[in-house]
């Protein structure tokens, strides 16, 4: 889990530096992004019949996460 979090924190650091994401703590962003993914993987491991449901939840999670952290341009 530590390597997974460090990997995603690095991605978020780069996206923040490029001005794509809001300047928030990349380590916290990584935890917020990864934790639901690991939860969904755990559900699929224990209940494979829920895979389609979990994939839909994953899609919605990723979309919501990036809507929340994407750097919005100021209105002019």
Language model regions located:
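Alpha-helical elements of the RecA-like P-loop NTPase motor core of helicases
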Residues: 6
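C-terminal peripheral helix-coil segments that are non-catalytic and often amphipathic
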Residues: 9-18, 26, 32-76
